[in-house]
Amino acid sequence: QEEFGAVVMMTETDWNMTDEPAIYQEYPKPIRHLSASDGSTLNLGRTRLRFMETPGHTPGVLSTRFTVYDNGYPHEAFLFGGVGLNFSGVERTEMYINSVQRLMQLEGIEVNIPNHADSGEVFDRYEMLQDRQDGDPHPFVDPESWDAWLDILKKNAQSKLEREQRAAN
């Protein structure tokens, strides 16, 4: 924000979290600008971002659904804002699993835009994109990998939940 003047948008839950003592002291507290909630939208030019609260990684994770285009053809994309399992507690892990299960119910998602580049085979897909020829499918348009990725997230979270439950007892 200091360097680029970026406007920050978060859920009220996560804005409230920023008022708590910082866990990561090396990051400055963000300046509060905009709040979003489940079902809210933001138009950027002709692109409409549709927001979904997907708690787990933080209590108020914000995820985004939007339309992308390949040679004029629309495809539904989704950015899951809280992929990481680097948190603790049974309740938060259950929240995460519930969020993943909710994402599994979404229809029509064809493009996975992960919030961390090492997730969702981003670099491999980028390399395929560099060699793409006319008529080749776009490597990021891959609805089957979206479903498979969510299955992996759920399985990993269920394993974490078992560990968290053992630690709590």
Where are these regions (language model features)?
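Active-site HxH/HxHxD metal-binding segment of metal-dependent hydrolases
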Residues: 1-41, 141-143
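N-terminal cationic amphipathic segment used for targeting or macromolecule association
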Residues: 4, 131-140, 155, 166
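Metallo-beta-lactamase
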Residues: 41-43, 48-148
